[in-house]
């Protein structure tokens, strides 16, 4: 296995590059709709494409190419990437939906009862739709193959 350029580990380098590409796309995606680049998105979760998906899929792709699909590293990567992908579309997405509902509920109670502002601005942009995860996987696969 050849050493990587960034961390001295080719597999880790590819995963970091895939994550960066996904996040970098999110910064400039608003420009396709005539809006300004949103640099805050570089460090936020959620959105298109899933950087979690691109990271773990590029990792597993690199392991498959460099170590083989019968390697222990590939097996470990597959198990953990499955957990990450499930978490992104299932648990984290549901948590984001719960946050939306709670934020609406708190605003409703504040208006109805005339209460002071309740600190409840729960983060709503957490998980991913299946389509966002799909495109993250495509980006991860392409990155893993491109940087083999």
Where do the language-model regions lie?
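Helix-loop-helix hairpins and the membrane-proximal interhelical loops
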Residues: 1-24, 32-35
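Membrane-embedded catalytic cores of phosphoryl/pyrophosphoryl-handling enzymes
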Residues: 20-25, 38-148
């Amino acid at each position: 296995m050849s050493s990587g350029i960034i961390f001295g580990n080719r597999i880790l380098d590819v995963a970091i590059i895939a994550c960066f590409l996904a996040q970098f796309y999110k910064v400039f995606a608003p420009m396709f709709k005539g809006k300004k680049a949103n640099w805050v998105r570089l460090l936020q979760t959620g959105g298109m494409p899933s950087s979690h998906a691109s990271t773990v899929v590029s990792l597993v792709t690199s392991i498959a190419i460099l170590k083989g699909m019968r390697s222990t590293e590939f097996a470990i990567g597959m198990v953990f990437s499955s957990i990450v992908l499930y978490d992104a579309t299932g648990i984290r997405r549901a948590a984001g939906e719960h946050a939306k509902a709670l934020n609406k509920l708190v605003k409703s109670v504040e208006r109805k009862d005339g209460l002071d502002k309740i600190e409840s601005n729960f983060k709503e942009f957490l998980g991913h739709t299946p389509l966002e995860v799909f495109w993250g996987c495509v980006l991860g696969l392409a990155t893993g193959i491109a940087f083999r």
